[in-house]
Amino acid sequence: MTQESQAPSVRPEEGWHVLHLYYQIDHAQWSTLSRDEQLEAKTNLTELIQEIRSFPETQLLTFAVTTPKADIGFMLLTPDLIAATHFEKRLTLSLGADVLAPTYSYLSQTERSEYTTTREQYAAETLVAEKGLKEGAEEYEAALTEFDERMEKYTQHRLYPVLPAWPVVCFYPMSKRRGGSHEYNWYGTEYDDRRQLMKGHATTGRKYSGKILQLISGSTGLDEHEWGVTLLAHDTYQIKAIVYEMRFDDVSARYGEFGDFYIGLQLPLDELFRRICL
């Protein structure tokens, strides 16, 4: 039994904690290590990554960051905040004291969408109002069954995602405006209006199915912004395209506030070490 499993746990009622970690490498400190010490340090990080990935219900993405904002990044998903914190400390020290200098971090949780269409809404708005189907009809019931299956899969991805090893990883935090010097206040807007705005946003997102995998994690009360957005893609063109197109949706144009964007490249560990000059 590992140290993490013996410790008390802090787990949300549903979903996982998500921790984004970004570091710069102190190459001056790294250069003070002998060749054998450097090899030992890289072996230590490699073994730690393997250990974390073998931990129950846990995923760890590793990537080289493409700008001087950072050199290396990690995205950790795990239910237990105590385990996440322990892994974070070990990752920070994995190459030796003071080699990895934290430059940015973000804590959030996977969560359901507040604006997901319910079974009742789908039946009334789509099956009856739009398609003219009658409750109890064979086509009506088949459509409801298909909707239930689709929403179960969607909710599973929101709460317990399986993230692929697609090469491009984009992360940015965001919040919704709440008035002040702005005309628009998301939190003063009626729910039905907010739902319609988010429905339009979702329509834009579906155009990128198979090109972009998006994970929205909530961070109200946990970190500086209200959500963390992680995008996985095969190239940066699709990242740029979806972010640009969504900026024209009213929900972003009127209410969106965004933090810095971080772009990383998921690579095999040997290539990752070469990419960050270790």
Feature annotation, model-predicted:
Residues 130-215:
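Surface-exposed interaction/gating patches
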Residues 49-70, 98-112, 200-225, 242, ...:
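Short, glycine- and small/hydrophobic-rich beta-strand elements in well-ordered beta-sheets
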Residues 1-64:
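An N-terminus-focused feature that recognizes amino-terminal "leader" regions
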Residues 19, 35-44, 244, 250, ...:
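Activation on folded, globular domain regions of eukaryotic proteins
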Residues 34-55, 92, 186-211, 247:
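Short amphipathic alpha-helical segments
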Residues 26, 62-164, 234, 265-268:
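Hydrophobic, ordered structural segments
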Residues 20-28, 171-177, 266:
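Short loop/turn segments at strand-loop or loop-helix junctions that form parts
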Residues 21, 66-80, 119, 170-174, ...:
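Short, well-ordered beta-strand segments in beta-rich or mixed alpha/beta enzyme
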